[in-house]
């Protein structure tokens, strides 16, 4: 899904306002990442000082350091929070939350990590898309843009699911049983 501009001049992603028009040139304050493993998406419960965020799920990531580029900041945050090194990051878009510009990237990972830094995060879990929809409906998402970011990533960067086939793959060994002779 491509982003477009509403009649009010604000950018829309996944049908909702992402960054108000007057903030389009705002510097990036925080970075977040949609991590996808197969059909599941990683959400984290951050170690937050804000009472309203306790127990809520959000995308991994954090604040940029002085003069740090967004991609470098996200790579650093993913190592700090999850011990995860990622190579390929695609930019999904920017979202405005609590007076800060959050740049969101997406990445497919081959294995669902279960490790995290307890000083940074309280918990992590991998959710099906329908479960993320339910978390939003129940008010259990931290910033309110998690579902929009995941939706934008799914639509703009669909993962090709492997179809099961009965045909033999090139180079694969044949497994036909030999006929027994009487």
Where are these regions (language model features)?
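Unchanged
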Residues: 62-146, 178
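A generic fold-level signal
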Residues: 26-28, 36, 51-52, 99, ...
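Acidic, metal-coordinating catalytic segment for phosphate/diphosphate chemistry
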Residues: 2-32
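Nudix hydrolase/Nudix homology domain
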Residues: 50, 54, 118-182
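Active-site beta-strand termini and strand-to-loop segments that position acidic
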Residues: 35-38, 107-109
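Conserved Nudix-box catalytic region and its N-terminal flanking loop in Nudix hydrolases
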Residues: 36-80
